[in-house]
Amino acid sequence: MRFKGLDLNLLVVLDALLTARNLTAAASSINLSQPAMSAAVARLRNYFNDELFTMSGRERVLTPRAETLAPAVRGALLHIQCSIISWDPFNPAQSDRRFRIILSDFATLVFFEKVVERVAREAPAVSFELRPLDNDPDELLRRGDVDFVILPEFFMSSAHPRAALFDETFVCVGCPTNKQLPRQLTFERYVSMKHIAFRVGGAQMPSIEEQFLLEHGLKRRVEIVVQAFSMIPPMVSGTARIATMPFRLVQHFKKTFPLRIIELPRPLPTFTEAVQWPTLHNSDPASIWMRQIMLQEASRM
């Protein structure tokens, strides 16, 4: 099938190639033989009058033309999938859908475990692929590479729809045996102590609590940066370090680690944990069902 001289089947080939940036991997992802893939690439290069890829050492690099084509091609294929190809009616009890979700260990431990338990009862064949926080979840949503992102709204873009799940507050914690900890810390004492800091996906942007401190002209002394909240309690235990964590997560970890909440002269900020999904999934019955489950479970917290 051709549209204005372009074999539309080649769009699938081009998307696979732009995603994998490797002929063998791209061919495998769409079940093409290596010779068929090479022939398709030659036709694409001829149509666009562009090499599409160049070699930089051992790395295959997109040409400027290919960089421009990548989001347009993926968007076109997603639109066809979500808006033109008709969906089968979604039956949770019979579905084997796998949802790909980016979320933190905080969201997993205090919220998503309940979602998993409920889904296991209502839709036993539905499964999840839980992925760690990423530096650019917006791009993954745009490409349709994930179904949901669960994050504080502070980190979300306005490019995709979202819904608030629950509000949470940060608290400062330390080890109960740390004799340097007074009942209440001044902000000056708080920023001077050794901190364990959580950063979203290793991003350079300030975290919520760091943004709060910057607004008050303060900068804390960070000794250790971690990418999972679950790494904090063992690194606080038996030390003079302190950390800033979501309150519900502190309550969770207090069952297994000695943690003491330390008062500050002013409460640390409250944030809203939210769920975001690709715009093209707005009308996807499976996505709608999953969103309803999450919102219902969040309302019970």
UniProtKB/Swiss-Prot annotation:
SUPFAM superfamilies: Periplasmic binding protein-like II, Winged helix' DNA-binding domain. Residues 23-43 bind DNA. One of its GO terms (molecular function) is DNA-binding transcription factor activity. PROSITE patterns: HTH_LYSR. Residues 6-63 form the HTH lysR-type domain. The keyword Repressor applies. It comes from the Bacteria. Pfam families: HTH_1, LysR_substrate. The keyword Transport does not apply. Keywords: Activator, DNA-binding, Nodulation, Repressor, Transcription, Transcription regulation. Belongs to the LysR transcriptional regulatory family. NodD regulates the expression of the nodABCFE genes which encode other nodulation proteins. NodD is also a negative regulator of its own expression. Binds flavonoids as inducers. This is Nodulation protein D 3. It comes from Mesorhizobium japonicum (strain LMG 29417 / CECT 9101 / MAFF 303099) (Mesorhizobium loti (strain MAFF 303099)). The lineage of its organism: Bacteria, Pseudomonadati, Pseudomonadota, Alphaproteobacteria, Hyphomicrobiales. The gene is nodD3.
